[in-house]
């Protein structure tokens, strides 16, 4: 995991660790300039590793984004940001996206009062995301919320930390996407 971060730069969804200053790939001499192919491949890999997608899943999202109206890149990022695992990460209910996937897979999360165990579930505006009423589920989320640094919450989400409840207000705005993509 850390090799990927060193190679591609900071991936906030994968881990909170940052590459050290001694491992800066820009300081090392590379032969020749970066080709267009290499730049596109690195950006694709950033998306894959940040959101925890397989190649096939990413291709499906690209296909859906290509059919939609508007900028394909922007629509693709909106689709990826509206996944349930990513919304849990943005709400601070999980420290990383893989941690959020585990919460969903282990059936700790309810969307609109129904258990959802699919991390790629596409959330819609006005969806209410809560934890199961079990003590263990609430304890897991409570630990994540207490230990996570309180970053500014995106406009499209609201959280009630006392009831362990999150609300999707609208589709994400492009300025809140935390990943820098060329």
Curated annotation (Swiss-Prot):
Segments of this protein annotated with the region Disordered: 12-36
Q: Where is the S4 RNA-binding domain?
A: 82-143
List the GO terms this entry assigns under cellular component, sorted alphabetically: chloroplast; small ribosomal subunit
Q: Name one GO biological process term.
A: translation
According to the UniProt entry, the coiled-coil residues are none
| Pfam family for this entry, one | S4
What InterPro entries does this protein's entry cite? Ribosomal_uS4 (IPR022801), Ribosomal_uS4_bac-type (IPR005709), Ribosomal_uS4_CS (IPR018079), Ribosomal_uS4_N (IPR001912), S4_RNA-bd (IPR002942), S4_RNA-bd_sf (IPR036986)
Residues crossing the lipid bilayer are none
Q: Which UniProt keywords apply?
A: Chloroplast, Plastid, Ribonucleoprotein, Ribosomal protein, RNA-binding, rRNA-binding
Gene Ontology molecular-function annotations = rRNA binding; structural constituent of ribosome
The record's subcellular location field reads:
Plastid, Chloroplast
For this protein, the record's NCBIfam families field holds: PRK05327.1 (NF003717), rpsD_bact (TIGR01017)
Q: Which family does it belong to?
A: Belongs to the universal ribosomal protein uS4 family.
Q: Oligomeric state and partners?
A: Part of the 30S ribosomal subunit. Contacts protein S5. The interaction surface between S4 and S5 is involved in control of translational fidelity.
Q: What does this protein do?
A: One of the primary rRNA binding proteins, it binds directly to 16S rRNA where it nucleates assembly of the body of the 30S subunit.
Q: By what name is this protein known?
A: Small ribosomal subunit protein uS4c
The top of its lineage is:
Eukaryota, Viridiplantae, Streptophyta, Embryophyta, Tracheophyta
